[in-house]
């Protein structure tokens, strides 16, 4: 079966608050669409011929931390094939956090893909199409060619290609209005992806080829039919593309290494002050503690004029990304010379770069704690005034989960330092210590937790593990009416010609139960039980008749005085024990598939008007954002089989799902009955998040 994506959200970055930032340095009006001459038609034809076949519409399932869980969300974006091996370039914000990726080519062929690597700082991700899954004899995938973004000029005609709003591929035409589009420093925090300031290294190509949400990741193409940018941002008719030279460099490094390695020095810079005497150089705004720059003696107020032999200059914000690219692109561990101006005098220092850490490590779900959490980086530790990066940063908490129920409760933003007196270095250590504490235990285990909140240190006790429901006391076996009724109110009695009468009216008789066997019918008015009046005349008396029946023993006979039509008659009913309540039936909650099922009750079958021979289990609930819900399973469904194996009870469901966690199939097919309909529900788990 083919992957059938759920209703996608369209992935696109739209700067609603940054409209003023996109004022082009030089604007030229686009040629009206209804006045395209023959030369323009040739340009369009060439661009479309060279790139359009290589367009890719991308559907993704991404995992995002929320309420102590990694929730699944669907999304859609665009991309372009850049090699015969099936490599696809798109944006990080489209596919960088994807657990499942499916691509539709321009000819509507559908191919699954894997994430090769991603770079949030440049907002570039690379996918690889699963070409081995294609049918034999099919033609090679079309490939688009890179162009030189440095050759792009204001006024150049360009074409934005992609899949706006997740619809089929499209092309729009416009011109370049700015080749150095940036976000001003006072608004740089407005565009961060996974903590990374994208604008620190990117100068966008601004253009007015119309783009919408869903165009993200699609190519910006010149008249020669070459990729000169990867579309990323949009506001109204103004779009911004990552220059192809930067995108290509990042993509090639991802293909080679799976990620982008960058150097870090710890120097933070800004353009020279307006009253600066110096005519060149980059102003050092600050130096990070314990960084290579600090070790080299670089100070705030220094002007860097040369870095590793390259002259540098920055008098305006537009020049900052070039300096950052130079520093970040230096080989890790290289000793470089930095020339400075300090107090008007030249100074030369040397420093050795170190590897740059990501701004934010990826979050992970720790189900036994009811939280999502992530490791700390050097910068995260410094910003939190911590002496080292040991510990685990709590990202979100599941309400009612182990962390949420602790006193004092652990909150998002807290840093877990110790478990039972043992240091927690990172998430791996937390998992290991948790496993040690719960080994061989079936009930939750209380652990002593040291954690930091701000600059204060707190302690709490967390019950780690799954909380089992408390045993419920046995129910007394008392009979039930085996029928649904309504109170014979005064108004209803008068309307039915029974003024002054009290009792209940039968609204439903449960098939196969005592009332049905006795011959009770819908519409009967029950006035008395064994000669005792049913004193029910207002809505608050709804339980009067039921209470009268429960006073008898199971198996006893009760004579009902009934009015049917205009005739009064006696009906003898042998009283039965009520069916087992739903909360007393076998139940199974799967924390990985995030759904709860239970055995079907007699009342389930009655209320759903199902034949008593129906074999299956009831899906009691699915967790929003879980794999079951994302695949389309819903609370109220009757689960009949899994992968063609019948599921007559919850024990069988548990057995099948536990076996699936060992074999890890690509897909699991649930056959369900929903109302009068039956359907197949495909669930495609991301096994990386199972048993965590």
Spans of features found by a protein language model:
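Conserved catalytic motifs of ABC-family nucleotide-binding domains
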Residues: 301, 413, 523, 636
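Bacterial N-terminal signal peptides that target proteins for export
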Residues: 1-15
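Short, low-complexity, Pro/Ser/Thr/Gly-rich segments in the mature regions of secreted, periplasmic
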Residues: 681-692
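Serine-dependent protease modules
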Residues: 28-296, 300, 306-335, 341-346, ...
